């Protein structure tokens, strides 16, 4: 049986990972080891580990790493604390693989510790571009530390290969969030209009906001 360690640090990436977590948990040949860290354990961000427990994942490792600071120094220190915690967890669990998604510094810490433990890393959503943001440097650094790569598009797959990764280790599988779309129970038009208090027959503009 293979020990698969999956790391989650925020609600955003947990929502994408959830279908995969269920698959691993149900697989007779795999043993899921979930590591919950970062914002999930912070009162400032709503203690969202409780949502993970409500989904049935009640047994997991906790890695307390988030300092109450939004400075660059605080972020760097949080990453350092996180790396120490991940190293201790990996030493105890001895996973066969670490699965990570995205480009946050919590995930960078998880990847760096796994690499130094020579644990294979499976990285989801590599090869993407976020120009002008630190996310891009973190994402590409994680790519270079990883063994297996699961990209959302063929363009991203080619970018990972251009970075020197072996083509047979880079797989274009689509966006993981599609699994949620396939299973999501959608509102009908009438319910949607009622929930937002607005008729979709009227002209409208949809704006999304992604804070830096």
Describe the predicted segments one by one.
Residues 1, 25-27, 61, 73-80, ...:
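PLP-dependent amino-acid enzyme catalytic core
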Residues 5-8, 15-20, 24-25, 65-167:
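Active-site and donor-binding regions of nucleotide-sugar-utilizing enzymes
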Residues 6, 34-36, 100, 123, ...:
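Structural beta-sheet core signal
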Residues 7, 41-43, 146-211:
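A nucleotide-sugar donor-handling region in carbohydrate enzymes
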Residues 9-10, 36-39, 126, 175:
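Cofactor-binding loop segments of dinucleotide-utilizing enzymes, especially the Rossmann-like FAD-
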Residues 13-16, 42-44:
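Short N-terminal binding/cap micro-motifs at the start of the first secondary-structure element
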Residues 31, 58-61, 120, 169-171:
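Conserved beta-strand segments of alpha/beta enzyme cores
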Residues 32-75:
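Conserved nucleotide-sugar phosphate-binding/catalytic loop shared by glycosyltransferases and other
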């Amino acid at each position: 049986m293979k020990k698969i360690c999956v790391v989650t640090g925020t609600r955003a990436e947990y929502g994408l990972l959830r279908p995969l977590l269920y698959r691993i948990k149900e697989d007779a040949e795999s043993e899921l080891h979930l590591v919950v860290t970062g914002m999930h354990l912070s009162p400032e961000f709503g203690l969202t580990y409780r949502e993970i427990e409500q989904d049935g994942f009640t047994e997991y490792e906790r890695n307390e790493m988030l300092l109450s600071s939004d400075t660059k120094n605080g972020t760097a220190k949080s990453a350092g604390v996180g790396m120490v915690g991940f190293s201790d967890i990996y030493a105890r669990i001895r996973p066969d693989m670490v699965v990570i998604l995205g480009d946050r510094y919590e995930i960078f810490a998880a990847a760096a510790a796994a690499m130094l433990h020579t644990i294979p890393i499976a990285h989801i959503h590599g090869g993407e571009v976020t120009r002008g943001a630190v996310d891009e440097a973190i994402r590409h650094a994680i790519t270079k530390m990883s063994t297996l790569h699961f990209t959302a598009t063929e363009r991203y797959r080619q970018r990972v290969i251009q970075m020197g990764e072996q083509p047979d280790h880079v797989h274009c599988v689509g966006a993981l969030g599609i699994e949620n779309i396939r299973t999501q129970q959608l509102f009908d038009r009438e319910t949607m209009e009622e929930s937002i208090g607005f008729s979709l027959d009227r002209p409208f503009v949809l704006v999304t906001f992604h804070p830096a």
